[in-house]
Amino acid sequence: MIKWLTRPADYAPVWQDMRAFTAGRGAATPDEVWLCEHAPVYTLGQAGKPEHLLNPGAIPVVMCDRGGQVTYHGPGQVVAYTLFDLRRAGLFVREYVRLLEDAAIGTLDDFGVPGACRKPGAPGVYVPLGPAGELAKIAALGIKIRNGYAYHGVALNVDMDLSPFLGINPCGYEGLVTVDMAACGVRRDLVDVGQRLAERLLAAMPEPAGATR
């Protein structure tokens, strides 16, 4: 099931709704993907270090229960929250992370963004930038798994103001360059990109016999 949330969405209520959905689901609960475009916010994961918040300015900061460091969400970025039953699908964490990355890479390829790839030791999706082909981040991952149920998900930069990323060390990496699809010469509607990403995510989930989605 794919569900679009009200745009722009405040981060904290969406996070709490994910937690409530996860706490209330059972073995037969269908998987869902929630798509949204957030109001500007910095989020700090469980490993987040305050020193990676360089200059937050007026943008609110929310500490949350996903893995990872600090990132930015805001208008022009589509976030796909993946409420998936990993135990039912028979997926381990590493396989699940790869599934998220593959879905983002496939979506970028679908819309004509060239060269999307992984970067060893740095989760997320990257694209080559400039003559030297330096890898710049275009999609970030953050997950939480509770009793075999996953929530949080993947954020893909479509066409956004990238300047707030200068106020942080994105994902804890000093000097990491962040880009969006528009910077790669591809301007597409955020809803279209989000829908394709969600479809790829759901299609990639192994579905045991008799399961519903």
From Swiss-Prot:
The active site is at residue 171. It is found in: Cytoplasm. Its EC number is 2.3.1.181. PROSITE patterns: BPL_LPL_CATALYTIC, LIPB. Its main location: cytoplasm. The record marks 137 as: Lowers pKa of active site Cys. It catalyses: octanoyl-[ACP] + L-lysyl-[protein] = N(6)-octanoyl-L-lysyl-[protein] + holo-[ACP] + H(+). Residues 27-209 form the BPL/LPL catalytic domain. In the reaction, the free carboxyl group of octanoic acid is attached via an amide linkage to the epsilon-amino group of a specific lysine residue of lipoyl domains of lipoate-dependent enzymes. This is Octanoyltransferase.
